[in-house]
Swiss-Prot record:
Pro residues bias spans: 661-682
Any GO molecular function: exonuclease activity
Region (Disordered), start-end ranges: 136-162, 567-690
Main location: cytoplasm
Lineage: Eukaryota, Metazoa, Chordata, Craniata, Vertebrata
Name of this chain's protein: Exonuclease GOR
């Protein structure tokens, strides 16, 4: 039978506890032993140990927050039974823990390669952290020694050998956590629609690139982030798949970086204006393409020189410009009967297939003559060529010597009203691709179809504007003069919507003609894709007038650069070359360049190599025309006169050819010199290397 020898084995208030305590006090040493706790448990649970002191000490352990409370009388383990003697022996040599003068405000536990911060606690006990290797119990104890109250003291942690372990306890001041500011925590939100194949990681990468480029020209970081987010959203909305998204974002990034120059590098505005004059439309081209001209008799009127198709005989009958159906209208222009309009918004395109060519609509791939794939509430008409009143004409302006008339790109958007197409938006871009004027316009008549698929104008855009067509005309007349170059694609439709008469225009539809010729025209979208590598007019929200105007301007700049590359460069000739452009050998039979365009190289051969094979062959056929070079401006060395060497450097070469020993052939008397025939009948000349 085991005998209880420690007071802690009995429950609080048990009678035997006092008796055991008295027996233990007699066997205890004369000096008190401090409390000791092993530092490391080597993976095994080790309970708290308390050495016996001279006075009775009652220690109660507080239960942990996690898990149930531990019963004080749990049975001993093998490790505990073997570990007690060793701990008692080492505890006798340990000094007492120092007393703290003030209450610790924070505790930080430092471990090898790891630091962990302990939270503040309002409890009077010391708060320690729990690691993966061991658990430290939180305990509070009170001890009275020599009639004074002893404060709670944290004990030093030691290992088995009596040395301090690597885990130390440091008491520091109150730690202030630095938190980032609110603007840095705000991140752009990328919205994602269902069914899209563009990864979000790819979108974030290009959004970051857009932001970096926008920071170079935006006033603030917030403005740059908003602009970059809008650019990425536009590219994402018009991209059904990943490949299309990559094409759009690359074009957008190229535009933001400014890789596509807005004007010719190193070329002034006046020089650019002079270069664009060769691409202007002539009077015949203006009439052929339907540009308005001032009416000779009626002020404010316009006249068109294109053949107009004959409409229905009844003045109240109109023809729908979308489906081709005839419908009746009232005096106000409204439809008499409510009829649905079934139409195809795409064009008819012919493609090559096995066995021939097939014509299909680009919108739904249906055959011509099929029922339309789109439905509108009523029929509409164009009507711009029916009302030719209210036109204004640009006038000449006096400019200073350093000024030039100006170069602008123009694009307009229109909606269907009761009287046909009317202006709802106008955008003007200068030669630097900067938007100088952009506004929505309120039509004079009631809108029946906003045509948002192509115009990009909505009901909300028109509702918030009060600008009318006469106000727009006044502003444009202040910008333009009669000499100002206006650039656009099918610009006659824009001028008819603006009711503006201007003849100094550059039309990209004429500058880049269709391979079938007039009246076929290539679309601006195809031209931008073929020549600029850009995808435009691909948004579901409709066209953007500023985007179309910039595309027209870039196409014209591309044409100017191409013309500058293929144009021959005129090099200035040296004085020696101008004095003697064609060096010749002295000969009595040679014909001077002034009397004949024949090359002196051939005449030099005849004088110096008369006995040669070639000289003999030429003399045997006196009716054969003498060869001349392709370009009469070229000299004997095959170069232009400005690049020919001097006469002294060419004469030794001719002399060396003339001193070669002739072949043994019979001599033939030389033919008398004759006049050189027309240069067009001359064959290709022989080279000196032959």
């Amino acid at each position: 039978m085991l005998r209880a020898t420690a007071p802690c084995w009995f429950p609080p208030g048990y009678p035997e506890a006092k008796k055991v305590a008295e027996e233990a006090a007699l066997e205890a040493p004369e000096f008190p032993l401090p409390s000791h706790q092993p530092a490391q448990s080597f993976g095994l649970p080790v309970p708290q140990m308390h050495n016996q002191a001279s006075a009775f000490v009652d220690i109660q352990a507080e239960p942990q927050n996690r898990g149930p409370a531990v019963h004080p009388a749990w049975p001993k383990m093998v490790t505990e039974a073997c570990y007690f003697p060793a701990q008692r022996g080492s505890a006798c040599c340990l000094p007492a823990a120092p007393r703290l003068t003030e209450r610790p405000s924070g505790v930080r536990i430092s471990a090898p390669r790891k630091r962990k911060t302990i939270a503040q606690s309002s409890s009077p006990c010391l708060v320690t952290g729990c690691t993966d290797a061991k658990r430290t119990r939180v305990a509070s104890s009170s001890q009275r020694s020599s009639g004074s109250k002893v404060g709670r003291q944290p004990g030093k942690t030691r290992n088995r050998s009596g040395m301090a372990c690597k885990t130390t306890t440091t008491i520091s001041s109150k730690r202030i956590v630095r938190r980032p500011s609110l603007p840095s925590l705000k991140k752009p939100i990328i919205l994602r629609r269902s069914g899209c194949q563009v990864p979000t990681v790819l979108r974030r990468g290009y959004l970051q690139l857009f932001t970096e480029e926008c920071l170079k020209f935006c006033a603030s970081k917030q403005e740059a982030e908003e602009k970059a987010l809008n650019e990425e959203k536009v590219a994402y909305d018009c991209s059904p798949n990943k490949n299309r998204y990559l094409n759009v974002v690359l074009n957008t990034l190229k535009r933001l970086k400014g890789l596509t120059p807005s004007s010719m590098p190193g070329l002034s505005r006046a020089a650019l204006y002079s270069r664009l004059q060769e691409f202007l439309l002539s009077q015949d081209q203006l009439k052929e393409n339907g540009y308005p001209f001032p009416h000779p008799e009626r002020p404010g009127g316009a006249v068109l020189f294109t053949g107009q198709g004959k409409g229905p005989g009844d003045s109240s009958c109109r023809v729908c410009c979308r489906c081709g159906t005839e419908y009746l209208v009232s005096s106000s222009g409204r439809c008499v009967r409510d009829q649905l309009c079934y139409y195809h918004w795409g064009r008819v395109r012919s493609s090559q297939v096995a066995g021939g060519r097939v014509s299909q609509y680009t919108c739904c791939a249906a055959a011509p003559g099929s029922v339309g794939c789109q439905v509108a509430k009523q029929h509409v008409r164009d009507g711009r060529k029916d009302s030719l009143d209210g036109f204004v004409e640009t006038f000449k302006k006096e400019l200073s010597r350093d000024a030039y008339p100006g170069i602008y790109a123009l694009d307009c958007e229109m909606c269907y009203t009761t009287h046909g197409l009317e202006l709802t938006r106008v955008t003007v871009v200068d030669a630097d691709m900067r938007v100088v004027y952009d506004t929505f316009v309120k039509p004079d008549n009631e809108i029946v179809d906003y045509n948002t698929r192509f115009s990009g104008v909505t009901e909300a855009d028109v509702a918030k504007t009060s600008i009318t067509l006469p106000q727009v005309q006044a502003i444009l007349l202040s910008f333009f003069s009669a000499q100002t170059i206006l650039i656009g694609h099918s610009l006659e439709s824009d001028l008819l919507a603006l009711k503006l008469i201007h003849s100094t225009v550059l039309d990209t539809a004429v500058l880049f003609p269709h391979y079938l010729g007039f009246p076929y025209k290539r679309s601006l979208r195809n031209l931008a894709a073929d020549y600029l590598g850009q995808i435009i007019q691909d948004s579901q929200d409709g066209h953007n007038s500023s985007e179309d105007a910039n595309a027209c301007l870039q196409l014209v700049m591309w044409k100017v650069r191409q013309r500058a590359q293929i144009q021959p460069r005129h090099r200035s000739a040296s004085p020696a070359a101008l004095a003697c452009p064609w060096p010749q050998a002295p000969s009595t039979t040679a014909i001077s360049p002034e009397s004949s365009p024949c090359p002196p190289r051939r005449k030099a051969k005849e004088t110096g190599a008369v006995d040669g094979r070639r000289g003999q062959k030429a003399k045997s056929n006196p009716n054969r025309p003498l060869p001349v070079p392709r370009n009469p401006c070229r000299g004997p060395s095959g170069l232009s006169p400005s690049l020919c060497p001097s006469q002294t450097s060419v004469l030794p070469l001719i002399a060396s050819r003339s001193t070669e020993p002739p072949l043994p052939v019979p001599r033939v008397p030389a033919a008398p010199p004759r006049a050189c025939p027309h240069p067009s009948a001359h064959p290709r000349p022989l080279s000196l290397h032959h």
